[in-house]
Amino acid sequence: MTDHALLLVNLGSPASTSVADVRSYLNQFLMDPYVIDLPWPVRRLLVSLILIKRPAQSAHAYASIWWDEGSPLVVLSRRLQQQMTAQWTQGPVELAMRYGEPSIESVLTRLAGQGISKVTLAPLYPQFADSTVTTVIEEARRVVRDKQLDLQFSILQPFYDQPEYLDALVASARPHLQQDYDHLLFSFHGLPERHLNKLNPGHSLEGSGDCCANASPEVRTTCYRGQCFSVARDFAARMGLPDDKWSVAFQSRLGRAKWIEPYTEARLEALAQQGVKKLLVMCPAFVADCIETLEEIGDRGLEQFREAGGEELVLVPCLNDDPQWAVALNTLCERAPVSL
């Protein structure tokens, strides 16, 4: 074993489904300035208001999808970590969560204490967003600075357009698309429009189509919405899907600010009203199934679709611990550029 570790980083999860644990997790998550990008006093006030009712509501949602082994996101991430140990030959493979445990700080501190000198930091997010990729990188920077750790980093870049990722996504989903269905909906996690406007002022996010169809490469590099459409378009091309067989929407809105559109809730209703009876839903913003896929789409989305006139909603599993995904991820991590 060499001194080059691979650190997989996912979002995180409450320690349990108790209201207290969910409140603690939500507080850490929502107080991240990359998640709610408001001045600290305003953010603190807003989060305090959210934490009045949201922990109990979220605890109920977590309880509905919790596994015997624990949080699905954590369990599936652990399984991927195990798969990666057979792929990554340069050193240990570790797992950290941006929020909750195991923390980035605890894992990096332990690795440095074990004599590790190089770390490939792998944020497990196909598309770029400050609230996912940037916050992971900045937290690693903070830990290295505050703990004075002597670590050299390579950083996995967003891989939404990489053939290895797309091929693994197609291979994983193909069995589900070989059954009869009326429509495939790609439901990506949403973001407030202001997050994107800060990165690319003046870039139009209007309409229901790809906002980056005619954008410059510089804009595409940081436009989360355009990268989501890119994934859907490339997937559809690989599967030979006609344009009227698939569409894109964005889920998980929080608060009153305008988020990127079209919204998944509205799209579910519209598809049902258009006569779609059997709907497949993929969530390619996530590489592991979690509360946003299992509960928000698999449970609440199904209920909403049926209430609008649909009959069956099939949630296509995320990549999770698929062996081809592990091979693809290893390839992507091996060519990650040196940074930090």
Swiss-Prot record:
GO MF, one annotated term: metal ion binding
Keywords of this entry: Cytoplasm, Heme biosynthesis, Iron, Lyase, Metal-binding, Porphyrin biosynthesis
InterPro entries associated with the record: Ferrochelatase, Ferrochelatase_C, Ferrochelatase_N
Subcellular location: Cytoplasm
Catalysis: reaction(s): heme b + 2 H(+) = protoporphyrin IX + Fe(2+)
Domain of life: Bacteria
Disulfide bridges in this chain: none
GO cellular component: cytoplasm
Pfam families given in the database record: Ferrochelatase
Keyword RNA-binding among record annotations: no
Metabolic or biological pathway: Porphyrin-containing compound metabolism; protoheme biosynthesis; protoheme from protoporphyrin-IX: step 1/1
Documented EC number(s): 4.98.1.1
Residues binding Fe cation: 189, 292
GO biological process terms, semicolon-separated: heme biosynthetic process
HAMAP family the UniProt entry points to: Ferrochelatase
Family to which this protein belongs: Belongs to the ferrochelatase family.
Role: Catalyzes the ferrous insertion into protoporphyrin IX.
Protein name: Ferrochelatase
Organism: Pseudomonas fluorescens biotype C
Originating gene: hemH
